[in-house]
Regions:
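Short, well-ordered secondary-structure micro-motifs
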Residues: 32-34, 54-56, 95-96
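Alpha-helical scaffolding segments of alpha/beta enzyme cores, especially the outer helices
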Residues: 7, 28, 67-74
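Mobile active-site "lid"/loop adjacent to the S-adenosyl-L-methionine
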Residues: 16, 23-24, 40-71
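Short glycine-dipeptide loop
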Residues: 71, 76-83
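S-adenosyl-L-methionine
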Residues: 1-44
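Active-site proximal loops enriched in glycine and acidic residues that flank catalytic Cys/His/Asp
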Residues: 5, 23-25, 47, 54, ...
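C-terminal catalytic and target-recognition region of SAM-dependent MTase-like enzymes
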Residues: 80-141
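Short, structurally constrained coil/turn elements
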Residues: 13-15, 77, 109
């Protein structure tokens, strides 16, 4: 996944000087960043539906996403630009992402929340093949 990300950065023409590629347990990483006092202007997350950590920790998006988003708010800068969540979890609706963002990021920052489905157009039928959902908070400024 990191190699694919590096390729995308390179293909976009961006030098990547300020891009960090991190493979870690996201909750542990965010908790360390809070302790270090590090801040971010934007957060993009694409959490898995389910997973297990190195020590048997269980990740379940339906149980853990709200907590993750809330602790991520603690590492947003004073003037964040955006917070994007992408998910392919079948049991999660875009309205859930919208509500989580409204009750977390938008409560702390002035902005707007939008959500929707991610899909691939089927050329022959002009239908959309649903592939996932997104929730986005963005600054009004």
């Amino acid at each position: 996944m990191v190699d694919w990300c590096k390729e995308n950065v390179s293909d976009s023409g961006y030098q990547g000087d300020h891009v960090r590629y991190i493979v870690d347990d996201v909750v542990k990483f965010v908790q360390r960043e809070i302790r270090r006092g590090n801040k971010y202007d934007a957060i993009i997350m694409d959490p898995p539906s389910y997973g297990r950590g190195a020590n048997g920790e269980v990740w379940d998006i339906e149980k853990n996403l709200n907590y993750l988003v809330n602790i991520c708010c603690d590492i947003l800068s004073d003037d964040p630009l955006f917070f994007l969540i992408n998910s392919y979890t079948t049991g999660l609706s875009s309205t859930v992402l919208e509500n989580i963002l409204k009750m977390s990021v938008n409560m702390r920052n002035n902005g707007k929340v939008s959500c929707g489905e991610v899909g691939i157009p089927i050329t022959e039928s002009k239908l959309i093949l649903p592939c996932g959902i997104y929730g986005r908070w963005e600054s009004n400024e």
